Amino acid sequence: VVLPLFIVSIIAFLDRVNIAYAGLTMKENLPWLTPEVFGMGAGIFFIGYVLFEVPASLIAARCNAMHWVARIMFSWGLVCILMTTMTTELEFYVYRFLLGLCEASLYPVIYSLLIPNWFLPKERAKAISLMLTSLLFSNIIGGPLAGILLDTTFFGLHGWRTLFIVEAIPAVIFAFIFAFWMKERPEHASWVTNAEKVYIKAELEKEEQQKQAIKKYTTWQALKDPKVLRLALIYFLWVIGFWGFSFWMPQVLKSLSGWPPSVVAWSIAIPMTAALLVQIYCGYSSEKRNEKRWHVATTLFIG
């Protein structure tokens, strides 16, 4: 179950941040792409993301989550393909906004619908930690892949256009594979035994009853909950640094080193590999010691 979600996450992250590597050569064809325009385009993605994250997630909760993920995956793949045709600053902004709109509900659907449908509470931490490694893993393979594609001609397209279209094609294709491979619930999966289906369903129903007995939560109550707001603030402060690093590191490294774009793209894999190893260790250490707060605080402080 984790494998198809892991693949979807890798593809999504590659299509989200490939602009960082494409920016190494885009200025050769797009003279209007100044650092200010690049930064604005990178950031506009999150405007679409924020505006549609909650509404799209609520819609997904009322329909088939599996088919919803397949639909948005196909959509963002098409947007990435269209980015190969852009010639103006406005088109750059529009495509980045649309990409954010299409990807907005992916992770909320995975973390709040699909994983809870398949994993018991005691198993979810491991499932989520595996999913989180997909972000770093995609960066590890994304840099070298971008380095190769920036020097590759594909059906007459070269450089950043090759990068966009080649990394978009897997999203379009895997959307169909995901729709047939992934099942929304264990009871819909043929590879799950009847005994396992009964056990999982009973445990999840028990969990739901316990939740209802404690407190019935509306969406508006969740948005006003101080605990939710504190966690949102912590996450917000973390992602500022994470996305700043992801979008700007290739250009900063190129400026400081003078290396060609392909070498810069390959070199990004080094810090990402180190980050992946530390993340795996922290997850293991946190579970072994049954401690979470200081593991998070220490790594955020060091970062």
Question: Which residues fall in each region the model found?
Answer:
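Extracytoplasmic
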Residues: L3-P35, G142, F245-P250
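Extracytoplasmic gate region of multi-pass secondary transporters
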Residues: I19-Y21, W220-Q279
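Helix-breaking motifs and short loop linkers at transmembrane-helix boundaries and internal kinks
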Residues: W32, N64, T85-E91, C102, ...
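Conserved MFS/SLC helix-loop-helix module at the cytosolic interface between two early adjacent transmembrane helices
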Residues: L51-L90
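Cytoplasmic membrane-interface "Motif A"-like loop-to-helix N-cap segments
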Residues: A61-M73, E287-L300
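Cytoplasmic helix-loop-helix junction between adjacent transmembrane helices
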Residues: Y95-T133
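Glycine-rich segments within core transmembrane alpha-helices of 12-TM secondary carriers
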Residues: A125-L150, P170-A171
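Symmetry-related core transmembrane helices of the 12-TM Major Facilitator Superfamily/SLC fold
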Residues: R161-F180
